[in-house]
């Protein structure tokens, strides 16, 4: 598991104009830390640092250490605002993490054995991904980087639901806890094969 860290500075000059100046003159991204029992804190991060961090998909489902003026905060990325036509991050929202409090986070699903599954390799079907990420609830130490969806034994016409997933100990799927056993993926008959049978 990779450790993620960012250096940040406390930001006292607030507002839309101040944020624009920060992005333009200092190549920094304005950000805010929310949550916990503390007041929201306005910070700034070097644009190149946050851009490099988010190149790794795992950064979105990992606890990140923010180094701010000699102190540290453990956070999750809650939201990113991006430029409409560039890949640049315009603003970031972080959520404070408290070690002994459960948190909710969205983690990606990694689909494995799709091409070698019974439904694809032996029955000529095609995999259809219904969702690509899922919300989990757990303690920060238990937060998974991703949840694996093994399609090896899935046949044509079968659907994989949240209840079929193997999740790490201490991790709860939020939708399932609320009685929503969502479809995750399925294998359906190939359209080419269907047309050939007509």
Curated annotation (Swiss-Prot):
Gene: rplY
Subunit text: Part of the 50S ribosomal subunit; part of the 5S rRNA/L5/L18/L25 subcomplex. Contacts the 5S rRNA. Binds to the 5S rRNA independently of L5 and L18.
Family assignment from sequence similarity: Belongs to the bacterial ribosomal protein bL25 family. CTC subfamily.
SUPFAM superfamilies reported in the protein's UniProt record: Ribosomal protein L25-like (SSF50715)
HAMAP family: Ribosomal_bL25_CTC
Name of this protein: Large ribosomal subunit protein bL25
Entry superkingdom: Bacteria
GO molecular function, one term: 5S rRNA binding
Keywords from the UniProt entry: Ribonucleoprotein, Ribosomal protein, RNA-binding, rRNA-binding
A Gene Ontology term for the protein's cellular component: cytosolic large ribosomal subunit
Gene Ontology biological process terms in this record: translation
Its job: This is one of the proteins that binds to the 5S RNA in the ribosome where it forms part of the central protuberance.
NCBIfam families: bL25_bact_ctc (TIGR00731), PRK05618.1-2 (NF004128), PRK05618.1-5 (NF004130), PRK05943.1 (NF004612)
């Amino acid at each position: 598991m990779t450790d993620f860290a960012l250096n940040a500075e406390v930001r006292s000059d607030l507002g839309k104009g101040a944020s624009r100046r920060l992005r333009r003159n200092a190549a920094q991204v304005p950000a805010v830390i929310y949550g916990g029992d503390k007041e929201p804190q306005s910070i700034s991060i070097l644009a190149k640092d946050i851009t490099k961090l988010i190149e790794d998909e795992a950064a979105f489902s990992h606890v990140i250490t923010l180094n701010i003026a000699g102190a540290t905060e453990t956070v999750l990325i809650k939201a990113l605002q991006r430029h409409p036509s560039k890949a640049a991050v315009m603003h970031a929202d972080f959520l404070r993490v408290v070690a002994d409090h459960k948190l909710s986070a969205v983690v990606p699903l990694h689909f494995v054995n799709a091409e070698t599954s019974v439904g694809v390799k032996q029955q000529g079907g095609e995999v259809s991904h219904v969702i690509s990420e899922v919300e989990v609830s757990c303690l920060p130490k238990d937060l998974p980087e991703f949840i694996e969806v093994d399609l090896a034994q899935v046949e044509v016409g079968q659907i994989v639901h949240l209840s079929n997933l193997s999740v790490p100990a201490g991790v709860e799927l939020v939708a399932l806890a609320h009685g929503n056993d969502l479809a995750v993926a399925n294998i359906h008959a190939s359209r080419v094969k269907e047309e050939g049978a007509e």
